[in-house]
Each structure stands twice: as C-alpha cells, then as structure tokens.
C-alpha cells in the first residue's frame, strides 16, 4: 500500500494536508474545507507534472540512469495520469476563483509565481545562464527552495487567520522554520540516498540528529506559553530523528521502500490532530 502511495504521487499531498491542518491546530484555527483540498490537489498536480517531465526529458536524452521507479510508473501510466492531473488543475482553478477571497488570492499569487518560476527553471529546455543563477540567491539549492515553497504553502493559511485574530505570529513562525528545515532535510536525504551507494557514508544521520536536538530545545522553550506550537515542533523533531534512523538502515531497504519511508516519517503531526 505504501508503495503505491508513493508511486502515485500521493505522498506529498498527504504531507501538505497533514501539516496545513497541524499548523491550524497549533493556532486554534479551523480552516475552511476548500483550503486543505486545494493544497492537496495542487501538490499532487505539481508532483505528477514534475515526474512526467523528468521522465520525458531523460528518455529523450537516453539518460536512463537518472530515472527511478516513480518516473517509470508515471511514464507507463501517463495516459491516465495526465487527464487526472488536468482535471485536478481545473478543480484548483475553480476553488481559487470561486472560493478564495480576493485578498488571499493576491497574497497567494506571489507564492504561485515563485513556484512557477522555480518549476520553469528546473524543467526548461533552455536553462538560464549559470552566471545569472549565481547572482540570484546563490545560497539556495534546489532542496532548500522546495522546502521553503512547500512550507509557505502549508503555513500561510493558518498564519494569516491567526494574525487576523490578533495572535502573535512568532510561535507559528518558529514551528514553520523547523518544518522548513525538516522539508529540506527530507529532500536532501532523498537526493543523497539516490546518488550514493549503500556502502558510502552519508551526512544525513548527523544532520537529522542536529535538527532533532534543535527542535527539542525549541519545544522546551515554547512549552510554557505556547504548548501547541511546542508539540508541533516536537513532532518535527521526531520526524527528523526518524530520518536519521532511516539513514542508518538504508542498506537494508529497497530504494522504493526507503523513498516512501522518507515521506511517511513526516506524518508525525497526525498524532496531534487526530487525538
């Protein structure tokens, strides 16, 4: 079951859904149903498109080594996935233009433009000159940009509603910062695991432990005044520690199982929102 959860690109939408609801839980905010639905649909469309385009470009260049099982799955089932993705994209458009308030639409257009620019940069046949890229956000790598965009999409609904109700944005921003680092670690770990031999040393274990320790310390600081934000930071720390443990046992897992597990361990906030 977890195998197809990953192969059908349902993993990222699930993570987006869980964390958006968790951020809302941390701020005592109830999100309208259309918000998590929009996030899940949009994430699924983006990931399906990303994997289909990756497969198409690699097959055209006869670069089969960079293709993983998820890419082959999407290529084999493209006649089903493409119409479904188009339908999901249309549903997203309907939600945005009929249910989303105009001020929120204006704010989110900035995030959408940034995501579109990144997506175009990654999949454009004519890449931007390297000197342009080095002069613009030279610190950011692909994994960090993905983590920041993903986090922004998940936290903005709760952050805007919490701020509108007079809540301080600091606790939720702190939790979002930890989640952004966790999302980066997830992407970085996947990249390292897929490009290293199982016997090669990986930095993921130590990086995950450092992030887990930082998260635990932040959770302790937040507990007295913001117990829910502290609990969410603690959940992120547990996820980080689980990524470290996956790094230790990666030689015993198949690449597909390892890739699916890397996203599965991000669902720790379920323990908070379902209790």
Spans of model-derived segments:
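Aromatic-anchored, glycine/proline-accented short structural segments
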Residues: 155-217
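Non-cleavable N-terminal signal-anchor transmembrane helices
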Residues: 1-45
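Hydrophobic cores of alpha-helical transmembrane segments in multi-pass inner/ER membrane proteins
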Residues: 16-21, 114, 148-158, 181-187, ...
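Alpha-helical transmembrane segments of integral membrane proteins
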Residues: 7-12, 34-38, 79-85, 106-110, ...
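Transmembrane alpha-helical segments that form the membrane-embedded catalytic/substrate-channel core
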Residues: 41-56, 113-126, 178-195, 239-248
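Helix-coil boundary and interhelical linker segments in multi-pass alpha-helical membrane proteins
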Residues: 20-38, 93-107, 154-177, 219-230, ...
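Interhelical loop and helix-boundary elements at the membrane-water interface
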Residues: 1-14, 55-85, 119-148, 195-210, ...
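Transmembrane helix-loop-helix
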Residues: 79-128, 208-256
């Amino acid at each position: 079951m977890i195998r197809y959860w990953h192969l059908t690109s349902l993993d990222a939408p699930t993570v987006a859904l869980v964390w958006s609801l968790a951020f809302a839980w941390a701020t005592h905010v109830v999100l309208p149903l259309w918000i998590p639905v929009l996030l899940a649909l949009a994430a699924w469309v983006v990931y399906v498109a990303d994997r289909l385009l990756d497969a198409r470009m690699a097959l055209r260049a006869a670069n089969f080594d960079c293709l993983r099982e998820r890419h082959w799955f999407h290529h084999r089932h493209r006649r089903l996935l493409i119409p479904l993705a188009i339908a999901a994209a249309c549903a997203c458009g309907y939600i945005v233009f009929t249910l989303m308030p105009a001020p929120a639409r204006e704010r989110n257009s900035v995030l959408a433009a940034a995501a579109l620019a990144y997506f175009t940069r990654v999949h454009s046949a004519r890449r931007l000159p390297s000197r342009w890229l080095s002069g613009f956000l030279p610190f950011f790598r692909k994994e960090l940009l993905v983590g920041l965009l993903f986090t922004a999409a998940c936290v903005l609904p709760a952050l805007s509603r919490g701020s509108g109700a007079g809540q301080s944005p600091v606790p939720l921003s702190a939790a979002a910062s930890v989640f952004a680092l966790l999302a980066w670690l997830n992407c970085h770990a996947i990249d390292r695991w897929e490009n290293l031999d199982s016997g090669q040393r990986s930095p993921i274990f130590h990086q995950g432990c450092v992030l887990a320790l930082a998260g635990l310390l932040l959770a302790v600081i937040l507990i007295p005044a913001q117990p829910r934000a502290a609990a969410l930071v603690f959940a992120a720390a547990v996820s980080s520690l689980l990524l470290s443990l996956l790094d230790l046992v990666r030689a015993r897992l198949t690449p597909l199982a390892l890739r699916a597990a890397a996203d599965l361990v991000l669902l720790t906030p379920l323990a908070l929102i379902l209790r």
